[in-house]
Amino acid sequence: MSSGLYSTEKRDFDTTLDLTQIRPYGDTMNDGKVQMSFTLPVACNEKGIEAALQLARKMGFVNPAVAFSEALDKEFSFYVVYGATSFSVDYTAIKVQALEIDTMDMHECEKYIEENFGREVVMVGASTGTDAHTVGIDAIMNMKGYAGHYGLERYKGVRAYNLGSQVPNEEFIKKAIELKADALLVSQTVTQKDVHIENLTNLVELLEAEGLRDKIILIAGGARITNDLAKELGYDAGFGPGKYADDVATFILKEMVQRGMNK
């Protein structure tokens, strides 16, 4: 079921790119076109479609249209809405704590360890708290890695331990002490109701209570993890989508050398 996707109304846009006023791009610069999807707790019918349109208008959409709607069951429906927004942001004023590292591949990391470390580097990773997902930590830790990027278990000079999922923070720290970890890698996939914020904060507090926080490299990762967020929560770095084991390894190794932790 769809509704009114196309309009014959002529619209003119300033097609000049202005980084102080950037808008979403559909097929014309500054047209502000946006696609959004959501679920409503109502039946999929004409009334449900109108509810979706009214919500889109209240969100600032101009001339919204329901491109797709589908019943999930008798009392829930799914919608894809197209529209345009007149809002813009000043791209030049945005400040972020982006990780600026010259990523080394696996072989370069191994050579870096050989030249700068007199021992193996111990990296311990897990999905901690109640998070039962391992896809993120496996992509970084497991030998086969992900998307052509081998995991830390394959790196010569690295002793990598993947503790899996649903590891209590207390057990994670206990294992880190036992293994004499240089770096802890925490993956958080479940983020509903900001449960990941609470769990990540709890880990930092426990490490500080044990007097370990300044003695290790602490990394957070996940689909909704940014470096800004990780730093704010007390981590050394955060890695989100599109990052691989070589990115993580490069940061850890160079940070250890900078802190004099490589002896």
From Swiss-Prot:
Modified residues (N6-(pyridoxal phosphate)lysine): K144
Family of this protein: Belongs to the KamE family.
Domain of life of the organism encoding this protein: Bacteria
Record's protein name: Lysine 5,6-aminomutase beta subunit
GO molecular function: cobalamin binding; D-lysine 5,6-aminomutase activity; metal ion binding; protein dimerization activity
Keywords annotated in UniProt: Cobalamin, Cobalt, Isomerase, Metal-binding, Pyridoxal phosphate
EC top class, as a word: isomerase
EC number per UniProt: 5.4.3.3
Coiled-coil boundaries: none
Catalysed transformations (reactions): (3S)-3,6-diaminohexanoate = (3S,5S)-3,5-diaminohexanoate; D-lysine = (2R,5S)-2,5-diaminohexanoate
Pfam families in the cross-refs: B12-binding, OAM_dimer
Cross-referenced InterPro entries: Cobalamin-bd, Cobalamin-bd_sf, KamE_N, KamE_N_sf
Pathway where it operates: Amino-acid degradation; L-lysine degradation via acetate pathway
Residues that, per the record, bind adenosylcob(III)alamin: 130-136, 185-192, 219-223, 239-244
